[in-house]
């Protein structure tokens, strides 16, 4: 990068799905000697511990959703306050590039940068472009995508699209060095269930009940690791305690989740972009249950990509009930060659160097802008 004292401003919503790829990019940029500042909303404090940024700027934000005119009006007022704060931040920081990772918290910083004629790069993690990124796409210098095909990219923005893949954290890359665990007729079976950085109650409602319905010889071989919300822990632990499992570990959050993915023979999870990217890079088969009710249906699209590749087994939440999950688990654990094939297919879809690809694109964008 040719600009003096280079600085890149990253804008990401305060959930793991947005912060994890931003963190992976920040590490690569820092390795290149580039200063990184993170702009996000108030939720970031709970998840940003150790984020590799020299500064974290809190920008007021809200999502204008729902049918209430008052609620939507209040959300737009908050976004307006965020835009004013973002204008001040962009002027003060004078970044070479502003990179957005989607979600409404990124709208004020990206829109401020575009109005101040600072180059902007959007990263769309999902197989369907989100509404915030769609709104910002026309003014973006470059659009990077996690999937090779992304629905909903504005036609005029398509020529500026570059497929980089979804950046994953160093812990995921380290876990990817672990081969798929061998399966034997009487050996251990490792099942991991989680619902993303914010948890998912449906996992606690369905997975323990499904496991309890498995044949006793299968349960005796089963080692379960499950993420559950704090209010669901006691119920899940009680069901597992009565099920006669080889072992069960239930907790609200696992800091070493990538390592636990690597140890799993099968994963049951939502299909957020970061989860899908991590499963692919590590190379683990999964039963994916897309989050229902989304206007964009992005998780369904993400799951469909892995399903089409033979790397995952998508299940709509309407079909995600204990009886059907138990049947899926029994069938898959009874077909080790099918699980191994899905693991290999998952690894083929992964892009382990996505963070480096995206970092190179950020630098190229800054250089192109500085030479105009």
From Swiss-Prot:
Main location: membrane
Domain of life: Bacteria
Record's catalysed reaction(s): di-trans,octa-cis-undecaprenyl diphospho-N-acetyl-alpha-D-muramoyl-L-alanyl-D-glutamyl-meso-2,6-diaminopimeloyl-D-alanyl-D-alanine + UDP-N-acetyl-alpha-D-glucosamine = di-trans,octa-cis-undecaprenyl diphospho-[N-acetyl-alpha-D-glucosaminyl-(1->4)]-N-acetyl-alpha-D-muramoyl-L-alanyl-D-glutamyl-meso-2,6-diaminopimeloyl-D-alanyl-D-alanine + UDP + H(+)
Residues that coordinate or bind UDP-N-acetyl-alpha-D-glucosamine: 15-17, 126, 169, 197, 299
GO terms of molecular function: UDP-N-acetyl-D-glucosamine:N-acetylmuramoyl-L-alanyl-D-glutamyl-meso-2,6-diaminopimelyl-D-alanyl-D-alanine-diphosphoundecaprenol 4-beta-N-acetylglucosaminlytransferase activity; undecaprenyldiphospho-muramoylpentapeptide beta-N-acetylglucosaminyltransferase activity
Keywords: Cell cycle, Cell division, Cell inner membrane, Cell membrane, Cell shape, Cell wall biogenesis/degradation, Glycosyltransferase, Membrane, Peptidoglycan synthesis, Transferase
Gene3D superfamilies membership: Glycogen Phosphorylase B
GO BP, sorted A to Z: carbohydrate metabolic process; cell division; cell wall organization; lipid glycosylation; peptidoglycan biosynthetic process; regulation of cell shape
InterPro entries noted in UniProt: GlcNAc_MurG, Glyco_trans_28_C, GlycoTrans_28_N
Enzyme Commission designation: 2.4.1.227
NCBIfam families: murG
Entry function: Cell wall formation. Catalyzes the transfer of a GlcNAc subunit on undecaprenyl-pyrophosphoryl-MurNAc-pentapeptide (lipid intermediate I) to form undecaprenyl-pyrophosphoryl-MurNAc-(pentapeptide)GlcNAc (lipid intermediate II).
Entry protein name: UDP-N-acetylglucosamine--N-acetylmuramyl-(pentapeptide) pyrophosphoryl-undecaprenol N-acetylglucosamine transferase
